[in-house]
């Protein structure tokens, strides 16, 4: 039995939702990636209720597309939600992990930002951990470029060892 995972992500620009189906057997294996665009009218903070519904619905649609032949092997979905507001002391995310879990019948892990803030972090715990994992392979040179509007980390070679 394979252990597969779905990772979802939407940027602060609120233009689309990206998803990947991956496994970590013998390193990172990206099995499939897909993108769904958001509606044009739901890109402002005033539309929070609509944003929450749309990110939930689009997440369900995207997960179902990613896992159509592998659903029985998917262990979990990582769903950070759509950032509505974020600073060092709090983060507000739109989207319903409970509905995504119920509709896809796959466990959903979410609210990473507030968990990180509660532990004294800046609310962006996943990317630095993923970069550390990705960059730990010493055989090849790698470069990571973060183009997000929320600064996550500036890893040094020493901090990754």
Enumerate the predicted regions with their spans.
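Short glycine-rich, Thr/Ser-proximal phosphate-binding strand/loop in the N-terminal lobe
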Residues: 5-49
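Single conserved hydrophobic/aromatic residue that forms the stacking wall/gate
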Residues: 151-161
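Short glycine-aspartate micro-motif
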Residues: 5-9, 74-78, 142-146
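Secondary-structure boundary elements
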Residues: 68-69, 106-107, 136-143, 147
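Short beta-strand-loop/turn "lid" adjacent to the catalytic site in phosphate-handling enzymes
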Residues: 47-97
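Short, Lys/Arg-enriched, disordered terminal segments
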Residues: 1-3
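Active-site neighborhood for divalent-cation/phosphate handling
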Residues: 78, 82-138
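Glycine/serine-rich anion-binding loops at beta->alpha junctions
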Residues: 8-15, 82, 93, 146
């Amino acid at each position: 039995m394979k252990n597969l995972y779905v990772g979802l992500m939407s940027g602060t620009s609120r233009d689309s939702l990206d998803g990947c189906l991956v496994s970590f057997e013998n390193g990172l294996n990206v099995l499939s990636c897909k993108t769904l665009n958001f509606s044009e009218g739901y890109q402002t903070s005033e539309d929070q209720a609509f944003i929450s519904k749309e990110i939930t619905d689009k997440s369900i649609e995207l997960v179902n597309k990613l896992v159509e032949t592998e659903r029985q092997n998917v262990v979990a979905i990582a769903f950070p939600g759509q950032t509505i507001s974020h600073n060092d002391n709090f983060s507000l995310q739109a989207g319903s992990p409970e509905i995504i879990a119920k509709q896809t019948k796959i466990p959903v892990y979410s609210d990473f930002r507030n968990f990180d803030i509660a532990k004294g972090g800046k609310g962006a715990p996943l990317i630095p951990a993923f970069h550390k994992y990705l960059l730990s392979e010493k055989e090849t040179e790698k470069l990571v470029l973060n183009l997000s509007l929320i600064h996550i980390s500036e890893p040094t070679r020493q901090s990754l060892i």
